[in-house]
C-alpha cells in the first residue's frame, strides 16, 4: 500500500522509533510546523513523526469525501509507524474528518478546532475567524465557540489565497499584504476584539496580520492550545516520554526537496525529508 524514497541524509537514527512511540503530527503542508514548534517548546522529550500531504495541497478547497480519504490513509500509515497519539495539525481535517476517524483507530486523535475555540472565548466577545474555504463552510469554529459561550458573536472569513501564498514563501510579498487587507476588512468593520487563526498555516502570517489589525485585537493560535491538550492527554494516559527524544522524522507525499527548503525558514534548520506514496489516497 505504501512505498517511500529518501531525500538526502541517513535515516538509521529512526531505527529505534518503535521502541520509543512517537506522536504523529500531520497537515497538508508546512502549516503544521506551527504545531511542531509548540511540541518542541511544551513537550521537548517527545519523539515526533511529521507528515505533510503536499501532493494534495491545499486541503481547504477539497470536498469532505476527499479530506476523509486522505486523512484515513495518513492515519493508516501512522498506525504502521506505531504512533501513540496523533495531532491533526490541520483545521480543515479537524473540521471535516475528526469525528469519523476517531471511531476507526485505537490511538488518541486530537484536533485543533476545539482547543482554539476554548481559547477564543477566554479572550473576547466579538470573535473573528479566518479559515480555509472548507473550514469556513463547515462552521466548525462558530459551532464550537457558540456551544462553549452562547453569548459571543462570531464572524468567519474564507481566505482561499493564504495557504498557496505561504507554501510559496510569499509572506513579505506586497500582494500578500493586499490580500490580507481584503480578508480582514469585514472583520475590522465588525469591531472584533479577537482573531482566531482558523488554519495552522496562518500564524506564519502573524507579522502581516498584526500590522493590519487594531492593537486591541487579540490573536489566538490554536496550535499553542492543542499541544497543551496533548500534554494533558499524555499525563492522563501515563504515556509521556521521559527519555531523550528521537530525531523528528519528516515525511511528505509530494516533493521532499521543496518541503525541506520551506522547513529551513520555519524551523531554523533543513530537515531530512522522506517521500511516502499513499497509493490508496484517491477519490473517484
Name these PLM-found stretches.
Residues 2-284:
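Non-catalytic structural scaffold of enzyme domains
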Amino acid at each position: 500500500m505504501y512505498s517511500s524514497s529518501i531525500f538526502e541524509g541517513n535515516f538509521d537514527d529512526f531505527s529505534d522509533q518503535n521502541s520509543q512511540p512517537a506522536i504523529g503530527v500531520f497537515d497538508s503542508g508546512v502549516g503544521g510546523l506551527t504545531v511542531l514548534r509548540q511540541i518542541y517548546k511544551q513537550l521537548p522529550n517527545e519523539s515526533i513523526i511529521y507528515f505533510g500531504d503536499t501532493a494534495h495541497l491545499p486541503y481547504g478547497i477539497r470536498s469532505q469525501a476527499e479530506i476523509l480519504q486522505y486523512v484515513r490513509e495518513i492515519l493508516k500509515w501512522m498506525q504502521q509507524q506505531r504512533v501513540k497519539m496523533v495531532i491533526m495539525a490541520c483545521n480543515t481535517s479537524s473540521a471535516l474528518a475528526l469525528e469519523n476517524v476517531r471511531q476507526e483507530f485505537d490511538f488518541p486523535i486530537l484536533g485543533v478546532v476545539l482547543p482554539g475555540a476554548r481559547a477564543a472565548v477566554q479572550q473576547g466577545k466579538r470573535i473573528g475567524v479566518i479559515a480555509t474555504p472548507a473550514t469556513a463552510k463547515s462552521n466548525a469554529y462558530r459551532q464550537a465557540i457558540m456551544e462553549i459561550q452562547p453569548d459571543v458573536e462570531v464572524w468567519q472569513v474564507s481566505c482561499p489565497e493564504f495557504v498557496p501564498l505561504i507554501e510559496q514563501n510569499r509572506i513579505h510579498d506586497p500582494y500578500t499584504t493586499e490580500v490580507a487587507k481584503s480578508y480582514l476588512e469585514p472583520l475590522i468593520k465588525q469591531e472584533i476584539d479577537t482573531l482566531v487563526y482558523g488554519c495552522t498555516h496562518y500564524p506564519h502570517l502573524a507579522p502581516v496580520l498584526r500590522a493590519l489589525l487594531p492593537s486591541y485585537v487579540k490573536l489566538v493560535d490554536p496550535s499553542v492550545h492543542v499541544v497543551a491538550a496533548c500534554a494533558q492527554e499524555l499525563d492522563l494516559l501515563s504515556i509521556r516520554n521521559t527519555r531523550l527524544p528521537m530525531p523528528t522524522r519528516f515525511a511528505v507525499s509530494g516533493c521532499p526537496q521543496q518541503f525541506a527548503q520551506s522547513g529551513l525558514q520555519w524551523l531554523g534548520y533543513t530537515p531530512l525529508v522522506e517521500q511516502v506514496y499513499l497509493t490508496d489516497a484517491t477519490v473517484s
